[in-house]
Amino acid sequence: MKIIHTADWHLGKILNGKQLLEDQTYILDMFVEKMKEEEPDIIVIAGDLYDTTYPSKDAIMLLEQAIGKLNLELRIPIIMISGNHDGKERLNYGASWFEHNQLFIRTDFTSINSPIEINGVNFYTLPYATVSEMKHYFEDDTIETHQQGITRCIETIAPAIDEVAVNILISHLTVQGGKTSDSERPLTIGTVESVQKGVFDIFDYVMLGHLHHPFSIEDDKIKYSGSLLQYSFSEAGQAKGYRRVTINDGIINDVFIPLKSLRQLEIISGEYNDVINEKVHVKNKDNYLHFKLKNMSHITDPMMSLKQIYPNTLALTNETFNYNEENNTIEISEKDDMSIIEMFYNHITDKKLSDIQSKKIKNILENELRKED
């Protein structure tokens, strides 16, 4: 049996003001073409199909087109669950009707102990839920953390487990020790959101969404597919794609399959003038770029200048300010006003004040002192 594991499509994502629908359309078209080659028995999408609870019309249309090609044209069964970014009601609309075409959508706990059986493999679904939702569902006020809530869910599933069959869990959560990125919205505020690996011991394999790194956790049977695209600059350089999971005679193996996106996220460090004069290495001018530059404080609008050469510049950081405070502590009380100004100017521009600048500043300081007298 062949299963394709994917998650975290985040359709409708906007990165630093840039709409990513073109990139998402490109990668989904590639994903569909790959599925024609793979001919899987089922596709699992482990949450966060959309980036927001109320996705745009274009994002909804993009999902419908992709799912239509995969499920209706290629006739591949699909199981999808909701993630913390998805609007459950919107994603679940028409779910009972879609099941006639083997498109299984799960957004709540009503079916957590009723597996979806495909080719003798039992797929248990555990969509994302807040601690409050789990507390309400189980009518148990003692549930205060995700660990407690997920443990309660697994205890509910346990009696239904067929130990003779292969049992797979699909969920959207953070496993303790998993690598995170900036684009992952925290699941909770003020409480620990991670879940210990041991809670999943009753399953033969676990397919997860939420963490965007495809190798977020090192485990033989607990796997994240990672996101289809790089969605924050903390993910720059990360491989993106999907997992191919095969089951032969009860033995489960998986391999990560990378996909090449239309554009990459790239971080460029250096001197402002070198970048403007195109003396730094940029993999692709069309990439989404974050520049971390020195010596640009004298430039009125450096971002505009950068965008004229690199149109997809999305972020700009003045590296001058990124210094080690412990090694650059200045006892201000021991410095006179002129010395402080000279040090500040040198720190910002890496230059010394000219004689003319020094003279003007001294005159200003002397005038201020006379006013005080």
From Swiss-Prot:
CDD domains xrefs: MPP_Mre11_N (cd00840)
Q: Which classification does the entry list for the species?
A: Bacteria, Bacillati, Bacillota, Bacilli, Bacillales
Q: Which organism is it from?
A: Staphylococcus aureus (strain bovine RF122 / ET3-1)
Going by the UniProt record, its keywords in alphabetical order are: DNA recombination, DNA replication, Endonuclease, Exonuclease, Hydrolase, Nuclease
What are the BP-aspect GO terms? Answer: DNA recombination; DNA replication
Its job: SbcCD cleaves DNA hairpin structures. These structures can inhibit DNA replication and are intermediates in certain DNA recombination reactions. The complex acts as a 3'->5' double strand exonuclease that can open hairpins. It also has a 5' single-strand endonuclease activity.
GO-annotated molecular function: 3'-5' exonuclease activity; endonuclease activity
Point out the signal peptide segment. Answer: none
Describe its partners and assembly state: Heterodimer of SbcC and SbcD.
Protein family: Belongs to the SbcD family.
Name of this chain's protein: Nuclease SbcCD subunit D
InterPro entries, from UniProt?
Answer: Calcineurin-like_PHP_ApaH, DNA_Repair-Maintenance_Comp, Metallo-depent_PP-like, Mre11_N, SbcCD_nuclease, SbcD, SbcD_C
